Amino acid sequence: MLNGSRGRAVGLALGYGLDRALADPARWHPVAGFGTLAARLEQTTYADRRSAGVVHVALLVGAGVAVGAAAEHGARHRPVAQALLTAAATWTVLGGTTLDREAAAVGRLLEEGRLPEARTQVARLVGRDTRTLEVAEVARAALESVAENTSDAVVAPLVLGALVGVPGLLGYRAANTLDAMVGHRSARYARFGWAAARLDDLLNLPGARLTAALATVLGADPAASVRAWRRDAGAHPSPNAGPVEAAFAGALGVRLGGRTVYGTGPEARVELRPPLGEGPAPAPHDVARGRRLAARVGLGSLIVLAPIAARPVRPRRR
């Protein structure tokens, strides 16, 4: 019999299945609407101070959590409605299949020898300057994006959904969207975007570790994944991308990391990232291997998290 906690687990599974089958909605995506709202609010809240960014994030993430809590409260005595609500929220929040299709296009173009088109395509996945990347660098950019996005577009939201339900799903996606919008180190957002970046780091901590663990267990070389994770992840500038990318590099037997350029012209910023893994530079066919590993990790995370979502909720004592 379907009850409230099982409804959450069923909803997560349904939402995951919808994302795998249909990807993101082609039109009227709620996340795009949220981004428009956030950009408009920024016109009022922006100031070159961390405190202004804290207010901006609190208002928008708080609104997402509140909407999710109100919707879940309304469905609390109707398990089927709760399952459908959770499924809709999960489908809205997950982005794994859309990103997988973008990465597949990069791999296909590289395998066909169409480097200029591959550079243009990989720019849809990463924020770095891709105009002069060579074949191995394009493959590396695609694999790093596949690894990181497996965590923050699939596993991390499922973790929050399993633990907190719809409020966790919507709050996570709000925080993640704000990080993408303002959580970077440009002159405008270095201070204002601090709160968005730190909150996104915090919310992604458990999901990134689960992603790295599953990549290690489900990859072709668990020992190499463990070595890369333990040895290389800590030197990465991101506390969450480091473990995930290192584990993927070890599992795939390739080397990630290296020189990365963000922006162009006078505002260009160069990061010399440490190497992750101990194999050769990735080849075009490694993009497809990374995508297959990401698919296994996504499904594995659902298998791990569904029982957590289905755990009985003890009634509060009065």
Give the residues covered by each predicted segment:
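Short amphipathic, positively biased membrane-proximal segments
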Residues: M1-R318
